[in-house]
């Protein structure tokens, strides 16, 4: 998989989750923050990243930098995905199903952010297993990265597209 250059893309970012952890010390409590950020150009490129810092804006900035390093290309066929797929990450599973034009993005919280920034307009999803936002985002991106168009499958199998589509 080749690396995608984030500097040439017009990326939008969305903060999906901000977590606060507390370390109790003799002098009181120390707070640190983690931010889960999704970036995408709404045209087939999407990535997620985690940033951790003592202040929320710093954590978000680090998350955006990390997300830009983890961009993937998503094959989009007529505003939806080419085929059904289940993405897994840890205990989180996300079922992604193609949908007819006009359906819209039927997805819960963290999954919706990933799909909208990927540029997918019509899709049905179901979260199975863990509802942890971090696992759901990673599972969605893992599922999207496994998608292949009919042309790619035909090339891999040395067949024509008509033979693949039946």
UniProtKB/Swiss-Prot annotation:
Organism this protein belongs to: Acetivibrio thermocellus (strain ATCC 27405 / DSM 1237 / JCM 9322 / NBRC 103400 / NCIMB 10682 / NRRL B-4536 / VPI 7372) (Clostridium thermocellum)
Described function: With S4 and S12 plays an important role in translational accuracy.
Comment block on domains: The N-terminal domain interacts with the head of the 30S subunit; the C-terminal domain interacts with the body and contacts protein S4. The interaction surface between S4 and S5 is involved in control of translational fidelity.
Record-linked HAMAP family: Ribosomal_uS5_B
A single Gene Ontology CC term: small ribosomal subunit
Taxonomic lineage from the root: Bacteria, Bacillati, Bacillota, Clostridia, Eubacteriales
GO biological process: translation
Single GO MF annotation: rRNA binding
Protein name listed in UniProt: Small ribosomal subunit protein uS5
Cross-referenced InterPro entries: Ribosomal_Su5_D2-typ_SF, Ribosomal_uS5, Ribosomal_uS5_bac-type, Ribosomal_uS5_C, Ribosomal_uS5_N, Ribosomal_uS5_N_CS, Ribsml_uS5_D2-typ_fold_subgr
């Amino acid at each position: 998989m080749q690396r995608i250059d984030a500097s040439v893309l017009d990326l939008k970012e969305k903060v999906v989750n901000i977590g606060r952890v507390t370390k109790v010390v003799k002098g009181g409590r120390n707070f640190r923050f983690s931010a889960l950020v999704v970036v995408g150009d709404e045209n087939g490129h999407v990535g997620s990243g985690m940033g951790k810092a003592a202040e929320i804006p710093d954590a978000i900035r680090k998350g955006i930098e990390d997300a830009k390093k983890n961009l993937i290309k998503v094959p989009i066929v007529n505003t939806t995905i080419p085929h059904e797929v289940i993405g897994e990450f840890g205990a989180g599973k996300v079922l992604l199903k193609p949908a007819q034009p006009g359906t819209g993005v039927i997805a819960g919280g963290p999954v919706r952010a990933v799909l909208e920034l990927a540029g997918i307009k019509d899709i049905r999803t179901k979260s199975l297993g863990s509802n942890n936002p971090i696992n759901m985002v990673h599972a969605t991106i893992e599922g999207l990265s496994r998608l292949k168009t009919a042309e790619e499958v035909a090339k891999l199998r040395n067949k024509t597209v008509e033979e693949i589509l039946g």
